[in-house]
Amino acid sequence: MLSLAQLESWFFIAPALLLAVLSGYLAERVGIINIAINGGMVFGGLFMALLSYGFTNNLNQSAPSWSLFITIPLSVLFSSVIGCLFALAAVKLRADHVIVGTGINLLASGITLFISQNAASLFSDTTLRVRYLFPIQTTVSIEAIGVFVFSLLLIGFVWYLMSFTKTGLRYRAVGENPNVIDTQGISVYKYQWIGAICSMMVAGLSGSLFVLSVSNFPFNSGDVNGLGFIAIAIMIISMWRIIPSIFIGLIFAYAYVFTNSQIGSNSNSYLLRTIPFIISLLVMLLFGFLNVAPKNIGKHFDKGLR
């Protein structure tokens, strides 16, 4: 069982992981391979950390919880810029999707490390950190529950949109057979741009929630503990379906929080960190034969093949 502090962390980690899976879903359903989820999360966490400094007057203060209604939306908005870069390279310039995703991951880590190493001169702080600190309570905080419920509602809305609307049908068809969509006079490129941008915005939201789970602790590693790569594994295991990904994601989030809680009291801390990734690999090996990825994933749209 999880302690109260671990449960509080789970209420932030679980939505972050589920939204990271949704980020991959949104891109790959329009045929764009998205291994940039981790980088998108790092950018979201970076924006969240930088914005949190705007609500503190000195190093002994934490940002007020009401400012989350400002910093989280702004983090998502700034992440749309990363989405535009992703779409520009993958759709407009027709670059290899895997290389583009790798580039975004490296860029995110590099920028975060650079800012963290210069935190003393930029923020008069010892290191880059998220300036939110939720007081210890006898129950899970309202902020954590609110984030969890909002994330589930957002995922439910996307599921309904993709499953029961004309827009969702067209969206998914772009990743299966874009030429059929093109013959109907519908812009394939428009849907791919929307998919890439929304994917990075959701990844940014995921990253901002992740750093809240480690609030007021250093965010100087240039990474989100590889949570974006676990999200890719969950997306594959759930066969690019939203509902199965929710249940699988909640289980993985529990395993992630539990193993991390044991790191401080165990000499084999580095080995414990690998457990979520080992589980991901084993499950992928066991259920890899069920791979039902979108048929046009990773392929650039060509009008000449109509």
From Swiss-Prot:
Sample GO molecular function, one term = transmembrane transporter activity
Q: Which InterPro entries match?
A: ABC_transp_permease
Q: Its principal location?
A: membrane
Q: What is this protein called?
A: Uncharacterized protein MG121
> GO terms for CC?
plasma membrane
According to Swiss-Prot or TrEMBL, what is its membrane topology?
Answer: Multi-pass membrane protein
Q: Which UniProt keywords apply?
A: Cell membrane, Membrane, Transmembrane, Transmembrane helix
Coiled-coil residue windows: none
